[in-house]
Amino acid sequence: MGICLICEQGADNSALSQLAERWGLVHDENAIMALVLTPQHLELRKRDEPKLGGIYVDFVSGTMAHRRRFGGGRGEAVAKAIGIKKDYLPTIVDATAGLGRDAFVLASLGCHVRMLERHPVVAALLDDGLQRGYQDEEIGGWLQQRMTLLHASSITALADITPQPDVVYLDPMYPHKQKSALVKKEMRVFQSLVGADEDADSLLSPARVLAKRRVVVKRPDYAEPLAGVAASAAITTKNHRFDIYPC
C-alpha cells in the first residue's frame, strides 16, 4: 500500500527500506499518512494534523507499563470476560490486534496470545513494539513466550489457525463518539488509516467455530451486538462492554 515513508535523522534508513519491503509498503510522497522511523521507534503520523503527534507501540514504558504495574490485574474487565480464574489461564487468539493493548494485559497475567492483524502498517507498528519489548530485561522473557504476531486477515486465518485457542477475542474498529482527547487523537489517526471494520460482522461465526470455550467481543457501550447476535453475558465498564459467547 502507499504511505509516506520518513526516516528521521539518526535513524537507520536501510532499516526503513527493509521494513517497507517486509510489509509491502510503497513510498508515496503525497500521502496524508506517514510511517516515520525515529531513532527510538516506528510511529504513525497524520501529516495534515501534526498536533495529533505520532502513534506507536510501547510495552516497556508509559501507559502500558503503568497499567501492568498498577492496573486492575485479574480484576480488569477484559480478564474477567476472557475467563481467567485461579490457575486457569486460557490460550487466546486476538483476531483484531490493533496496537496490542488488551493482548498485552492478558499476556502480562500469564495467558498465551496469538495476535492477528491484517493491515500492514498496523502490523508493522505492533511488530516494532514487540521487538523492542522482547529486548527488555524486565518483560522480554515472558513477552517472547506469550505474545506472537501473525500478519493475516482474520476472516481467512480463523479458518486455518492451529492449535485451537480456548478463547477468540474480537475488538473491531467502530465509529467512536468523541469523548476524550485520547479517543480523538488515536481514532482520528487510526480511522484515517484503516477506516471502520466494515466486514466485522463476518468474524463472529468463524470465531465461534474456532474457540474451544468462548468468544469475547469488545464493544462501545452504545454499539449494537456484533452481527446482531445477542450475547449470553457481558462484562460492562464505564464506556465499553465485553460480550461473551460460549462455545
From Swiss-Prot:
Q: Which GO terms describe its molecular function?
A: rRNA (guanine-N2-)-methyltransferase activity
Give start-end of the signal peptide: none
Q: Where mainly found?
A: cytoplasm
Family matches, as Gene3D superfamilies: Vaccinia Virus protein VP39, YhiQ-like domain
InterPro entries according to UniProt: 16SrRNA_methylTrfase_J, SAM-dependent_MTases_sf
Q: Which residues bind S-adenosyl-L-methionine?
A: R101, D102, E117, R118, S153, S154, D171
Instruction: Give the subcellular location.
Output: Cytoplasm
Q: Which domain of life is it from?
A: Bacteria
Give the Enzyme Commission number. 2.1.1.242
- Please state what class of enzyme this protein is: transferase
Keywords annotated in UniProt = Cytoplasm, Methyltransferase, rRNA processing, S-adenosyl-L-methionine, Transferase
Q: Which reaction does it catalyse?
A: guanosine(1516) in 16S rRNA + S-adenosyl-L-methionine = N(2)-methylguanosine(1516) in 16S rRNA + S-adenosyl-L-homocysteine + H(+)
What GO cellular-component annotations does this UniProt entry give? cytoplasm
User: What does the protein in this record do?
Assistant: Specifically methylates the guanosine in position 1516 of 16S rRNA.
Indicate the family of this protein. Belongs to the methyltransferase superfamily. RsmJ family.
Q: Which PANTHER family match?
A: RIBOSOMAL RNA SMALL SUBUNIT METHYLTRANSFERASE J
The name under which this protein is listed is: Ribosomal RNA small subunit methyltransferase J
Question: What organism does the record attribute this protein to?
Answer: Photorhabdus laumondii subsp. laumondii (strain DSM 15139 / CIP 105565 / TT01)
Lineage of this protein's species?
Answer: Bacteria, Pseudomonadati, Pseudomonadota, Gammaproteobacteria, Enterobacterales
Q: What gene name is listed for this protein? A: rsmJ
